[in-house]
Amino acid sequence: MFIDKVNTYLAAGRGGDGCISFRREKYVPYGGPDGGNGGNGGDIYFESDQHKTTLLDLSYRPKFKAEDGQKGSSGDKSGRYGEDLIIKIPLGTLIFKNGEFFADLKTVGERILIVKGGRGGRGNASFKTGRHTVPRIAEKGAPGETAEVNLELRLIADVGLLGLPNAGKSTLLSQISAAKPKIADYPFTTLAPNLGVVNYKGKHFTAADIPGIIEGAYKGIGLGFEFLRHIRRTKVLIHVIDVNGFDGRDPYENYKIINNELKKYSKHLAKKHVIIVLNKIDSAVSLEQIKNFKKHLKVKKLFETSAATGYGIDALLKEMLRMLEKPVAFSTEGEVEPLHVKKYIYEPEFKISIENGIFVATGAKVETLTEVTKFNEDESLRRYRNILKKMGLEIELKKMGARPGDTVRIGDFEFTFEK
């Protein structure tokens, strides 16, 4: 089954908690704190794989979760880092993260970080100072990043075969490559793109057979529209035309239909290198139709083939190689720039709003501090309050009208405001 669009949820691993421990050994007085740090949570990456041609395996997984980091331990031992999760996806996959275009994997083995694992919490050995020699403080591991991810596959093929239904595209692909697409004598036999690798005179290239396009495809009519995006990146287009016509129209009328659909869908597609192939020449019912087609077409080269018998295939392959050797200027039409370059934008340490009588403080710094603080440890709680005070949260709450006894919320933690 060919799947070219998938939505999934990614959750990086949480960091391991830091440890509170003190060195206790005979003959070692004042051993001091030796609680180790927690390990970082695992990251999640996408990596392009040339052997994958569909997103089918991802469609069965609505959620991916990386491994959490392990807790720190005594002896100043850090916890093990969570294992990174690497998800293989086909070449040419567009990645949309939280509704915005994030990356486009165009090269084999390209790997990109999507969500980062949480930082491991610090153990009490990390809080030792000259003045504070016996800290009873440790942090919880920070949660990993999460993201809603949409994947959209755009096949990367050197040659794209297109045309009206039943023009013989699948048969032609099976002649020039080892691909074995479904072939039958009725329209819309091909319901999804087929990829094949062509090996001709020591040269290799890929070819894709696109499902039949019908009139009005640019408006979303028929099957072909769903797959037109797959030929945006092809270097050469092979326009396959049934010599006997289709749907009661002669070959030239059918040729014009496909050309018009390409122009309406994308001006860039209409400007690509195109090889015109008049197929099923062995079953031509009228030589007059062939002459009429050539008369109206007015192109320097027209290839007459029979994909069923192999007639004209060798000449067509030579032309494909010749066209592929020409330089191609790829258009950026329909493409957008990735957003995975991090932008640094100044944000205040916190903002305060009032919701249903509760003072709500938001901001990356105060929320992260809240997430990693162990509130069941008295010393950790005192440290938490001192940091918030130094940040100016208490003064700002008073300015907003907070009084003793009012509720303050930061993240999932609520506490009572005191003077």
Curated annotation (Swiss-Prot):
Database matches in Pfam families: DUF1967, GTP1_OBG, MMR_HSR1
Similarity comment text for this entry: Belongs to the TRAFAC class OBG-HflX-like GTPase superfamily. OBG GTPase family.
Protein name: GTPase Obg
Chief localization: cytoplasm
Enzyme Commission (EC) number: 3.6.5.-
Source species of the chain: Endomicrobium trichonymphae
The protein's assembly and partners: Monomer.
PANTHER family: DEVELOPMENTALLY REGULATED GTP-BINDING PROTEIN-RELATED, MITOCHONDRIAL RIBOSOME-ASSOCIATED GTPASE 2
SUPFAM superfamilies xrefs: Obg GTP-binding protein C-terminal domain (SSF102741), Obg GTP-binding protein N-terminal domain (SSF82051), P-loop containing nucleoside triphosphate hydrolases (SSF52540)
Domain of life: Bacteria
Keywords annotated in UniProt: Cytoplasm, GTP-binding, Hydrolase, Magnesium, Metal-binding, Nucleotide-binding
